[in-house]
Amino acid sequence: MSTTAYPDTILIIDFGSQVTQLIARRVREANVYCEIVPFQSADEAFKRLQPKGVILSGSPHSTTDIGSPRAPQAIFDAGIPVLGICYGEQTMCAQLGGNVESGHDREFGRAFLDVQEDSPLFAGIWAKGTRHQVWMSHGDRVTSLPDGFTIIGTSPNAPYAVIADEKRKYYGVQFHPEVVHTPDGAKLLQNFVHRIVGVKPGWTMGAYREQAVEAIRKQVGSGKVICALSGGVDSSVAALLAHEAVGDQLTCILVDHGLMRKDEVQQVVEMFREHYNLPLILVDASDRFIGALEGESDPEKKRKTIGRLFIEVFEEEARKLGGADFLVQGTLYPDVIESVSFTGGPSVTIKSHHNVGGLPERMKMQLVEPLRELFKDEVRLLGKELGLPDSFIGRHPFPGPGLAIRCPGGVTREKLEILREADAIYLDEIRKAGLYDAIWQAFAVLLPVQTVGVMGDGRTYEFVCALRAVTSVDGMTADFYHYDMNFLGNAATRIINEVRGINRVVYDVTSKPPGTIEWE
């Protein structure tokens, strides 16, 4: 029997591709549960999850290099469908007796694929003899096939662009179906999980709610639970799930660390105490947090300090309650992914998430993380399932470390107050322009830079404020929002006129990658 809560699971083995997370998004959009695991732990994960099918990701590695990553032999011995994408196709061929070579013509970017044969992979999408746009990114290519495989699609520089062993249900594609630049890619992945693997589209937020509630009850038993409530969508959905699961065993704790947006603490208290009747304790720890952060400019130290203080405060409040056994957090799947290295060797961490890397090892409570398998848009769907209003579900993401990581350089009360006012004006302008729901995340950043200005007849020397706005689906990739210049001019004018301490406003036009959404 499978040890996962989801018997119909697709396992995605990550060989280090930058877009592996997009494979998971496409599979989830097909209402099928999947998990990403790094190739180093794929053997253990395969035994634990007992998946119905496996997808092998792309990779920056070359299959021809000595010691390059390989898929566990167990997946080929299990008699289940396997789809190899780019490097995944190449390692599957190499492991099953085919041949892969380097040094041939490379393909990067848009390419056109000619369908040579009909296949369940193409059913209802592509027909034999047709040509379709795909997105390629490869230097190596397959030069001979293992026994049982046939060519079902070709491109000018990839004669083995799509291959299939229909009997064993092994498929390989040299292109990337998970990216939007392959227009039919999502449908091809749906065909793999629905038609070929045979998994029905049963992964819904209604089903997840039932399973999550049951999992919380099983983990917690009769123990006391406290929930880290911030008022953001993630912690709020986690709190409502926990309350549905264990009722009066739960006490929510809202820590006012002095790093929240304008009026946010009061709004959260009113909503959860009065509307949802959740037991809520408000802890004013702003002096403690800001004192610990004062003068600290290293962003990693900021995050870890905030994570450590969060846990200290929760433990103290738990003792006041007579002890607590469990701590609920709104950790999401991207938090987990970004805090783990999938590329082998020493871990390369993008940045510590205060929910993950910032936690001290000797925490005295066990973590309950009911959302750690979900992407952000799935959390919003779950919030809707739980009855949260659309106006709340649609709120922009706000980081746990709060304004501290939107204030590069040393943190002071004065700088936080300046930033808080500028941010409130910016968001007000966005709402008045009717743009709030079109933007994934928008916020102000107070830079550790002062510039000369002129106000009235006097010279000023004040801070620079950067405005940030991005569009995204799940936070894994993002593009900057393309405002009308009149909007930016109006927002900048209001901020400079109404916020004492700022005399210059700039707009951030960096996408993710290469940047991250937050500045720190």
Curated annotation (Swiss-Prot):
Homodimer. Signal peptide: none annotated. Its EC number is 6.3.5.2. Disulfide bonds: none annotated. The keyword Secreted does not apply. HAMAP family: GMP_synthase. Pathway: Purine metabolism; GMP biosynthesis; GMP from XMP (L-Gln route): step 1/1. It catalyses: XMP + L-glutamine + ATP + H2O = GMP + L-glutamate + AMP + diphosphate + 2 H(+). The active site is at C86 (nucleophile), H176, E178. This is GMP synthase [glutamine-hydrolyzing]. It comes from Brucella melitensis biotype 2 (strain ATCC 23457). GO terms for molecular function: ATP binding; GMP synthase activity. PANTHER family: GMP SYNTHASE [GLUTAMINE-HYDROLYZING] (PTHR11922:SF2), GMP SYNTHASE-RELATED (PTHR11922). The keyword Nucleotidyltransferase does not apply. InterPro entries: Class_I_gatase-like, GATASE, GMP_synth_C, GMP_synth_GATase, GMP_synthase, GMPS_ATP_PPase_dom, NAD/GMP_synthase, Rossmann-like_a/b/a_fold. It is an enzyme of class 6 (ligase). Residues 203-395 form the GMPS ATP-PPase domain. ATP binds at S230, G231, G232, V233, D234, S235, S236.
